[in-house]
A protein has these predicted regions:
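Short aromatic/hydrophobic "clamp" motif used to bind/position activated sugar donors
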Residues: 87
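Donor-binding/catalytic cores of nucleotide-activated saccharide
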Residues: 71-76, 92-197, 201, 212-225
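Glycine-rich, basic loop-to-helix element that forms the pyrophosphate-binding segment
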Residues: 65-82
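Short beta-strand/loop segment that forms part of the nucleotide-sugar
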Residues: 30-41, 61-65, 92
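Catalytic core of nucleotide-sugar-dependent glycosyltransferases
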Residues: 207-215, 220-248, 269-283
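Short, well-formed alpha-helical segments that are part of the catalytic scaffolds
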Residues: 10-26
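A conserved acidic beta->alpha catalytic loop
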Residues: 36-47, 68, 97
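Membrane-interface aromatic/basic loop that binds lipid-linked glycans or pyrophosphate carriers
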Residues: 26, 49, 267-316
Length: 316
């Protein structure tokens, strides 16, 4: 019996994929599904060698032959072929921490839909810890400490990455949850629907997954096309929650498009104006009253500049 399926989208990153596979124990109840997203020929040859030298007995490789390219399409292919009772997602440039399996298997005989685990993060070049995981670790910390409605809503709808979550496979199938076929933020609506439909869930303070930061990943690549994809997904995200949550819950989340507007400025006036019109058309508020406070604006601007300068070396 396969208890756990680990689904990994891959594109041109065989060396880090090798590291990820080495972080997974070779147990009979684990299957690993790698879906290649039309890698370049050079990397396909390396991938073939990796297949031949792997120690994992339940390692399966698939190719994305659909008419959609991207991690979302690859993850959907992985879900279609997964046999495990539980699902973990991983990105090819990340890895699991030693002992992760002992933590996740504790939940195999439970009735949870989802179990959230804390991640950590490192700079791939220096090996130093980064801040990429902090938002998600804080969501878990706040929920475990406060356990109130606000911390629960934030855990459900702000933990928008697919990794560091153990998800019941039958829960995914029952609710027909899939990843979007978009260039960026393909995981946001998947995670949002997981948060909405789950009934029984748990949060663990054990760290099982390390996400890396490196040059050229989608999270550190600046392009108008990626911004527009994220903007459209944000509109879908906002609309879904507005239509499905009750008024009090939706208001508690305090969603607004301030961040999207600020991001659009990087690409010039026309993208900014286009984003403004699109957001207004969908009746998404641009800010909360606190942004009228000049001290808040200055503090926010300083934080944005600091973050940009800190991440500059990763940008293409």
């Amino acid at each position: 019996m396969i208890n756990l399926s680990i689904i990994i989208p891959h594109y041109n990153s065989v060396n880090t994929l090798r590291r990820l596979l080495h972080s997974i124990p070779n147990y009979n109840d684990i299957e690993v599904i790698v879906v290649d997203d039309r890698s370049d020929l050079k990397f396909k040859k390396e991938l073939k060698l990796l297949k031949e030298k792997t120690d994992l007995s339940n390692l399966f490789f698939f190719e994305n032959k659909s008419n959609k390219k991207g991690a979302g399409a690859c993850r959907n292919i992985g879900l279609e072929n997964a046999r495990g009772n539980w699902i973990l997602f991983a990105d090819a440039d990340d890895y699991f921490l030693q002992g992760f399996y002992q933590e996740v298997k504790k939940y195999f005989n439970t009735e949870y839909d989802v179990v959230f685990f804390k991640p950590t993060s490192v700079d791939d070049e220096t090996g130093q810890r980064t801040d990429r995981h902090i938002l998600y670790a804080d969501l878990i910390n706040n929920y475990m400490i406060k356990n109130d409605k606000y911390s629960e809503l934030r855990l459900k709808y702000e933990f928008v990455v697919p990794w560091s979550k153990l998800i019941n496979a039958s829960f995914i199938k029952k609710n027909g949850i899939k990843f979007d076929n978009v260039i960026a933020s393909n995981d946001v609506m998947f995670s949002t629907k997981v948060g909405y439909f789950m009934k029984k869930f748990a949060a663990s303070d054990h760290i099982i997954y390390c996400v890396t930061r490196n040059r050229g990943s989608l999270t550190t690549t600046l392009s108008q096309e990626i911004f527009e994809s994220r903007l459209n997904v944000f509109i879908d995200y906002y609309t879904f929650l507005k239509n499905h949550l009750n008024e009090a819950e939706f208001k508690l989340l305090g969603l607004n498009a301030w961040g999207q507007l600020v991001e659009s400025i990087k690409f010039g006036f026309i993208p900014f104006f286009t984003a403004f019109i699109k957001l207004r058309k969908n009746r998404i508020p641009f800010f909360e009253l606190k942004v009228l406070n000049p001290f808040w604006i200055i503090k926010r601007a300083i934080n944005v500049i600091k973050k940009h300068n800190k991440l500059k070396k990763y940008y293409k």
